[in-house]
Amino acid sequence: AEGPAWSSQGRYLLWSDIPNNRQMRWSEDDGHVSVFRMPSNYSNGNSFDFQGRQLSCEHLTRRVTRYENDGTATVLADSYNGKRLNSPNDIVAHPDGSYWFTDPPYGGQLYEGEPDAAGGPSNSAGKLNPRIGQPAGFVPAKRELPTNCYRIDPSGRVDLVVSEDQVPDPNGICFSPDYKKLYVVSTGKGPGDTGAGGKGDVFVFDVGADNKLSNGKRFSDFTIDGVKCGPDGIRCDVNGNVWCSSNAGRAVGYNGVTCWSPEGKLLGRIRLPEVCGNITFGGPKRNRLFMAASQSLYAVYTATQGAGPA
């Protein structure tokens, strides 16, 4: 499970089932689970903007899509400076109407969407056949861009806001409650990837009035008890605390969710019996933390509320 997002208008949770190329929905009213969208173009991260429209990061098509309230779909971004995106991973909305998203290489993995063409960073030996299991007419392509973060302006212009040199392999992304800080997770390489690769850190930037970022620094190296806990999805609560999912692999007891103060102090942990990929706050009062793990969804009521669109 990946990319959980809460619809306050529909009072449901949706998430991505990447390997099965579909999105799922859980209804709060009756607890019913159903297929929400299939195919999903191997979507990963999802969220909702301030108008209640779903935003989705698609691996297969290497694009960011917005689903309008009338049911139509709008492609927000699929390239930068004439080059195709890698595999948009996570996305958040800003009150000014812009969208900010990460573009790491993970969709180039065999199990997550579109493997690189022969010679690409995720298929350097050229032994993987990217066409197997894909739609008719599918044309594989090599990675064309570094792993960056972008901002989609309300006009439709796509701007680079965080480069690979600053945050390699960016993954989770979120704003502080006042939108004056941007948090970006830098994760490690995927299996067989020969790209830059992050080191499992979380970075924070100041956001200026002109949407320019400054004062970028490491927020946390995400090491607890000497164990590198592998951050992935990230969200802030209304108090500015930072909640982050944890993929510690075989380090039993370190998978789940961690909560950090705005100063980077560890406040607490939620331990799960499996790897946690992403999180979101939801429920009618937005005080319930939903956790998308490798094979399950978990939820816990908290004493705070998630920041972001109501």
Q: What kind of feature is each model-predicted range?
A:
Residues A1-R11, P39-E58, R63, N81-F101, ...:
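Beta-rich, blade/repeat-based domains predominating
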Residues S8-Q9, P19, E28-D29, F50, ...:
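Short, ordered coil/turn segments that flank beta-strands lining enzyme active or ligand-binding pockets
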Residues I18-P19, H59-L60, G108-P146, P191-G200, ...:
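Short, solvent-exposed loop/turn segments at conserved positions within beta-propeller repeat blades
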Residues R22-M24, R63-T65, T147-Y150, D201-F203, ...:
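A short loop-to-beta-strand structural motif that recurs across blades of beta-propeller domains
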Residues D30-P39, Y67-R84, N148-D169, D206-G226, ...:
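Blade-edge beta-strand/turn elements of extracellular beta-propeller
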Residues V204-K212, Y301-P309:
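Short loop/turn segments immediately following beta-strands, especially the blade-tip
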